[in-house]
């Protein structure tokens, strides 16, 4: 009897112990389902946050965009239709929240401007060449040897005709070199003002010289080859009156400029070794030699001779 009660009591205790276990199972499943549902709800949001999390890093990065633009312009002129092409490069850089844009011309000088300059050179060259042909034909027509043999030599041509042909040649070369200097000065963003005065007016007050004209020395030597008396103008490095400024050559030997002018009977400048008209260079240190400043005047002197 006691054994049966003990067995029954043991069975009831086992059932009471099993009930809480069974009651915890639904709770466990409910908790698991709840957190799984929350995890499923938060997972897309987390994915969105994680995907958006790269955007600030992308903002701190850099993005470069280069855009090439070609502009073609049609110009109607006397020679027909001319096409001018301009190339531009537009660069856009994005760094964080700042956006910088840069546009630059791919060519250093505008092709249209360069074409116009060389068109003017070609027109002048054509005109001078026609004049040279006219002078040459007139010389040949006056040569008796040309009528006999159909050939003429320089020794059979009069000095006046040879001088006329030489003037045409010098004018052709001088015009070409002057326009070439203008093109080079424009490409280097420099400015040169030529003083085209004639006899007795050799002032250089308007002659503003800037750097990047060192190649003009060889051009002045070209004209010095025709007149030996101008060779004394070659060996002097500078004509700037900067005696009190270091780094500038002295103008003690400027009297050689009077030798060139004395060849044609012009006013001498020997009494003025340091002219005040060159004081416009005081604010510009380190000016290179610029011997082409008398190129135009010398060409005028050649014509007048």
Curated annotation (Swiss-Prot):
Biased composition (Low complexity): 197-208, 247-293
Pfam hit, one: DUF5569
Compositionally biased spans, kind Polar residues: 92-101, 209-221, 231-244, 294-305
InterPro entries: C10orf62 (IPR037649)
Name used for this protein in its record: Uncharacterized protein C10orf62 homolog
Keyword rRNA-binding: no
Region called Disordered, residue ranges: 1-30, 92-114, 197-305
UniProt keyword annotations, A-Z: Phosphoprotein
Biased amino acid composition, Basic and acidic residues: 16-27
Basic residues bias locations: 1-10
Modification Phosphoserine occurs at: 39, 158
Source species, domain of life: Eukaryota
């Amino acid at each position: 009897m006691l054994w049966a009660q003990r067995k029954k009591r043991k069975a009831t205790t086992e059932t009471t112990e099993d009930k809480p276990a069974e009651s915890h199972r639904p709770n466990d499943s409910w908790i698991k389902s709840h957190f799984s549902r929350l995890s499923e709800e938060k997972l897309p949001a987390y994915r969105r946050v994680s995907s958006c999390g790269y955007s600030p890093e992308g903002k701190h990065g850099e993005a470069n965009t280069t855009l090439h633009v070609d502009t073609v312009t049609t110009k109607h002129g006397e020679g027909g239709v001319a096409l001018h092409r301009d190339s531009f490069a537009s660069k856009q850089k994005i760094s964080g929240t700042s956006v910088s844009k840069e546009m630059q011309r791919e060519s250093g000088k505008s092709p249209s401007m360069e074409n116009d300059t060389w068109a003017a050179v070609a027109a002048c060259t054509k005109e001078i060449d026609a004049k040279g042909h006219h002078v040459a034909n007139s010389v040949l027509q006056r040569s008796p040897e040309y009528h006999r043999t159909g050939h003429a030599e320089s020794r059979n041509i009069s000095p006046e005709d040879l001088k006329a042909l030489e003037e045409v040649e010098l004018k052709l070369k001088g015009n070409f070199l002057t326009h070439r200097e203008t093109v080079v000065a424009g490409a280097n963003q420099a400015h040169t003002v030529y003083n085209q005065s004639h006899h007795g007016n050799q002032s250089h007050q308007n002659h503003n010289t800037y750097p990047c004209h060192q190649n003009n020395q060889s051009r002045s030597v070209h004209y010095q080859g025709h007149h030996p008396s101008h060779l004394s103008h070659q060996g002097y490095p500078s004509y700037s009156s900067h005696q009190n400024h270091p780094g500038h050559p002295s103008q003690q030997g400027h009297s050689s400029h009077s030798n060139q002018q004395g060849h044609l009977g012009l006013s001498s400048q020997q009494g003025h070794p340091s002219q005040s008209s060159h004081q416009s260079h005081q604010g510009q240190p380190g000016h290179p030699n610029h011997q082409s400043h008398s190129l135009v005047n010398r060409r005028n002197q050649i014509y007048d001779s």
